[in-house]
Every structure is written in C-alpha cells, then in structure tokens.
Amino acid sequence: MRKFILTVLFAISYVFSVMAENEQATVDTSRVYNLDEIVVAPRNKEFRSLRLQPVSSTVLTGKEMSSLEVRDLRDISNYVPAFVMPDYGARFTSSIYVRGIGSRVNSPSMGIYVDDIPLMNKSAFNSHVWQLDRVDVLRGPQGTLYGINSEGGLVRQYTKNPMRYQGTDVNLGFGTRMYRNAEVSHYNKVNEKWAFSVGAFYNGTNGFWKNSLTGERTDDMDEAGSRLRLVYKPTDNLSFDWMTDYQHVCQHAYPYGTLDPESGKVLFEPDQNHQGKYNRNMVNSGLAVKYHGKGFDFHSNTSYQYLKDNLLMDNDYSAIDFVVVDQSQLSNAITQEFTFKDNLQGRWHWTTGVFGSYQWLKTTAPNTFGSDFSDMMKKNMRLDLAEAGIYNSILASMSARMPEEAAKAAIEKAGGVHVGVQMLVPCLFHTPQANIGVFHESNYDITDRLTATAGLRYDYTHSKIAYDTSGDLRLNFSIMGQNAMARVLSLYEHTESAGFSQLLPKFGLTYKFDNGSNIYATVTKGYRAGGFNIQMFGDIIQNDLQANSSVIMEAAQQAQSTHQDVERVVTQDEAKYEELYEGIKFKPEESWNYELGTHANLFNNLIHADLNVYYMQIRNQQLSVFTEDYGYGRKMVNAGKSYSCGLELTLRGSAVSNHLTWAVGYGYTYAAFKEYKNRASKNADEIDYGGKKVPYIPAHTLSAMVDYTFDTNLSFMKSLTVGANMNGQGKIWWDEANTYAQKFYAVLGAHICADFGLCKLNLWGRNITDSKYNTFAFSSKATGVEVFMAQRGNPFQCGFDLSIHF
C-alpha cells in the first residue's frame, strides 16, 4: 500500500509540474466531448446520445482501450463503476455482477451484444476483443428494449466499420510470462456502395502459475480467430451489413490454490492431479438490414451462433484421485429482431419491435470417480470388512488341510481375494430454450426541456430439459481367480418443461439545461428467466444409490455366492420425477429499479460528470451455490427477497489544450438479503441469512486514468504520451454467511506511447506495485472435508505493443 500511495503522489506531482510548464499558453482550448460525438455507433432503438438519455452508462473508445491494454471484457469491467467480471480461471466462466445481482451459472445478469448480435450462450461472453471502435456499458434494467437477462444492464461492442474507417492495421505485442499477440486487419471501401474488412488474430501467454503436483502450467493459453465483414449500400436509404466472427481457444484452467480464509492468503500452489483444461470453438454470424423510409427507420437483425467446447475440471481441486468432470457443450442458436422507429422532427419519438430466438443446447457431463473415491466408498459400504471376512473364511477352510502359511501362499497364487467398487455417472442433457418479445417505447417532449419516457415489453421464455443419466455402481469380486460383478444401474430419463412470461415496464423523466446538462429519474422492472439446473445430478445420483443400498447388497450377495455377474436396474416412478422437477427447477428473478441521476457538463465543458443513485427491490434472487450434500456440482437457488442500493460516479476531464485527459469512476453498492433461508446439507438445520451481504458483490469499485501528451518537434516522432491507470474493488464477501472476504485492493498500471506517424510504440506495465489479491474464492466439501480455494490476481507484468497503420 505504501508503494502504491507513493506512486500515485509521484504521478500527481508530475502532472501538476507539466501543467505549470504549460501555463505560458494564453488560450486553453480544452473541451470534453461526448464520446458519442467522437465515435459514431448505430442507434437502432434510441434517438439521442447516451448522455442525453435517462440511463447510467459508460463509453470506452478504441483509443482508450488500447492505452489500458484491454484484452477482453474482464479488463473493460475494471473501468466501469459497479460492474464486475472477475477472472475465474477460464474463458468458460463468464460471471458478471452489477448492482448487487449476478451468478456463475445459468442466466446472466447482463446482456452482451457484438455489432447488434445478442450472444445467447453465456460461455461465449468471455472472449478476446479486437477491432473495437467503442464499447457501451449501460447499467440498470434494459429489459424494455432488450429483453431477458439484461436485468443488470447491457454491454454493446462495436467493431470498426469499413465504410468509415479504411487502411491496414498491424498490431504486435510481447510481454513477460511470454505474453504474445498479433493482429492484422484490412479495411477497404471499394466504392460508395461496397466496403469490406477482413482480419485475423493470435493471442497467447505462458501464464503465471504452475501445478506443484504435475509441474504443468495452470493458466497458459493460446487463442486465435478471424473476422469478415461486408457492407453494401445499394441506395442512400438501404444498407446490408454482414459479419462473421470465429474464435478458438485452448487453455489450461482453474489455477486454484489453497486459501487461509482468515488471512485471505493463498497458502499452497495448485496441486490437482487432473489439470483443468478448456477448449472452445465458436462462430457468430449476423446480417443487419437498415432502411430509411419516409417517417420511419426499419432495422432487421438476424444471427446464427455456434459454440462447441470441452471443459475438464478436477472437481475436488486436490492431489487425490477423487472426482473429475468432463463436460462438453454443443450449442446452435438463431435470433431475429425487427425494429421500427420514427425519424421525424417533433415532440413524439417512438420505437417498436419484435424479437425471437431459439437455442439448441446439448450438454454431456460425465462424472468420473477415481481410486480415492472408490476407497472411500469401499470403507463406507464396509466392503473392506467383507473382503477380510471372505479371506478369513477361505483361509480357515484351507488351514484345516494344510499349514496356515501354505494356505496363505496358495490363496495369493490363485489370485487372492479382492473386492472393489467403481462408480460412473454418465450425464446427457438437452436444454433448448425459446424466447419471444414484443416491445414499444415512446419519448415525448412535454416542453422544450422536459421529456417523458414510457415503455413496455411482453416477454415469454419456454425452457425444456430432457435428461438421460444414471448411477452406475459396480462391485467387483475377484476370489482366487474367479471374477464376478454386482452392478446396480439407477436410471433417470425424463423430459420437463416450463414457461415464464413477464411484462417489463419503464418510466422516466428527463429535464434538460441550457449547457447540455440534464437530470433524470426512472422506474424500471428487471427480469432474469428461470430454468433448470443440470450440474447437481452428481449429488442426486449419489443420494439415490445410498437410498438403494439394500438392492446393492442383495446383488452383491448373489454375485458372491453364484460367482456370476448380477445386474439390477432401478427405475423411477412419476412421483419421484415430480419431486426431482421441483428440485432442479429455479424461479425467475424479478426486480424494480428506482434511479435518480444527472449528466452534467461543468466549467464550460472542461469536465463531464455523470452521477446517479439507485435502489433495487429484488424478489427470488438467483444465487449460484455448491450442492449441499457432496458439493460435486453447482446449482441455482432462489433467495426470497433482497435489495441493493448504491451510487455511481464518472468524471471525465481535459486540460492544457487537450494535452491532459483524465477520467475517474467510482461505484458503491450495498446489497443484502432481506429474506433468505437455506441448509448447509440436506439434514442440517435451516440457516437464516437475513441481513447478510450478497456474496461476490464488491462494496466499492474505483478506477482512474490519466494521460499527458507532449508534442515533439522531432522529425521522426509526432508526440509522446505518458499515462497511468488504477482500478480497485472490495470488500467482497465469498459466502452467504459472510464468514470470509477479500479486502479492498488496488492495481496500478502505466504506459508510455511514442507516436511515429506510421506506427506507435506503447510500453506498458500491469500491477506495477505487485498487489496481492484474490479474484474468486470458495469452499468445497467434495472429499468430505471442507477446503477453501482461491483464484489469485495476476502479479506484475510488463511488455510492449507496436501498432502500424497504413
């Protein structure tokens, strides 16, 4: 912390010394512009720039993201108030937390759009970002215009449009820990009607951590991809914009170390006997059609999305051979949206449209139980005593005819006496989901200063689950060369479905001032659809096999006495499936958001300030927790009632004739349970979590960035930019009981960029004070003993980027 404070003080003193040297300038032409004015993005549903709307938002330009060394959405979240996407150890995990809501599995809390394509599979959220022109982050429910799973807000990524941006970009990067990056993109406007862009990238790192048991790297990664975009404008009023993006990633994953929950320090390096791995291939393709008519604009967005991945996870996170999950997803999704909005000058502006989507998702997730699990089962089922009893019985019989030592030798020579247990849980799930939404929003200028906003969306989601899984328990008897197996197969094969419908209203008032500032108030409803849990079937099967212990023992006795294989099949009746339906289903999450804010232009546009306060009432909050009894998987549960309130502030400024630019962001979130009771295990007493803080939600988020550009008179260099940035967050509780947490931490970065005209060289450093912190922590009881694990934040890293444009 001392190093961090000294570094910040040095940076501040340096900035003021530079400003003092430039006081000789008689006229300061500094001005902060709305970023909507600098980087234009399509407004398919809105009429005004974001700072003129009644919404809390943050915009990052491509230039800012380059100086901040942004590589994915996790990096973007560091510079947006109250918006957190932590590093959980793999591209697979895309948890987003905002304004007190979020979860690690199932329905996301925010919607993600790339060039107006809504990403349907949560596993596609965490991907490499490149060719970006700008990113918009809208906080607060956006369901009226964007539908389900935008309860916390929306992220819109826009890539460079070849109609507006031309040339060839080559970006090369290299850093410590063998960070390497290469991107090549070409943008060509053939004529006034045709334009295209094509590009490819590679990104990789050797990572920071190693598996102390196997010696393998635990967080190294290689990923590559390409993107093609075609734009056709046959007339001034009609355009077609088609984009296809492909990405592949291959990485070692989940470098979780053993955590001391009291100190928050990681005591031991990762030591899993099965190193986690993640591989993913995905394609996102979309066609946008826009028509500018007389009195209205028409927009059509069609997309197809494909994702195929495989996740291997040591589910006990330890050196023992206990349980491994090998999960694969195959997802195909289509979306279609038609939007109409008026384009007339007048007091009334409206947007209306319809959205539909369908996603096919097939998941295979076999649980493989290892030798240490088998040894535990053998002991719990008293098979070790049975093995000893069989051996002693045979030994006593043979000892009556020969010396005991000779009898022992004869038994071993014949193959000995062995009783083993093996358990398999194959899982196959089909979970298709359909969604349709019809929406309308109107903005009416009551006066020249006061605008009223009202909107409504009807949203319907139909979720289905078809599962085919079983508990396959095998007892293997090997008695002096004679082998027999007792197999009990408990089958679960059923189909369930559920429908969820919702009306999502929005009300707002905006009052404008002469200098472009405004104040606003909104009331909006948020919504996350319900669905079905699939990761908890390992626990369900384990409980089922225990309930069928009499069947298992009867089969074992028959196999032992007949020396033949015996198989018993256990099926479930409708009453069992009805009980299971209630166990795997989770309800929709609903919320009401009340917000008051302002977008202020201060000191003749030297500073832009965006400030808002909000209060959210949440019902049936969706929480991701480990399954109670064994902890082999995670499931979504509903807390009865919760609430969150907070403040979000963003400041942007410019000085010294725009040579100095800076920004500060701060978010405060207080999120707590109002009514929530749960059990630590199936037979444990109920625990009341009322009044406890919602886990994984940082109470504070803080970010800052400052750049100063020196104009040079050198023939080979146009300018030199020196900058620093900081982001921090905390306190973060890691469990519902609020027993252990991550304290507030801050990470400092810096960069120096030399602009040579044709190319730019940027030297950068991340976490230059080498702060120690955890981005994720949890406890697991998979082995029967509770252990605490954590994902550490990345330590110091430095490198350079070379950008060439011609």
Task: Walk through the language-model features, giving the residues of each.
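C-terminal beta-signal and adjacent terminal beta-strands/loops
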Residues: 361, 374, 527, 658, ...
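Transmembrane beta-barrel wall of Gram-negative outer-membrane proteins
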Residues: 167-169, 174-205, 213-251, 280-285, ...
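Membrane-embedded beta-barrel scaffold of Gram-negative outer-membrane proteins
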Residues: 288-313, 518-520, 542-635, 643-645, ...
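Short acidic/polar hinge/loop motifs at secondary-structure boundaries
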Residues: 115-141
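N-terminal periplasmic accessory domains that precede
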Residues: 95-100, 113, 134-137, 149-171, ...
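Gram-negative outer-membrane beta-barrel transporters
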Residues: 341, 345, 351, 355-357, ...
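Solvent-exposed loop segments that connect transmembrane elements
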Residues: 210-216, 254-271, 316-323, 368-426, ...
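Extracytoplasmic beta-strand/coil segments of soluble accessory domains associated
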Residues: 57, 74-117
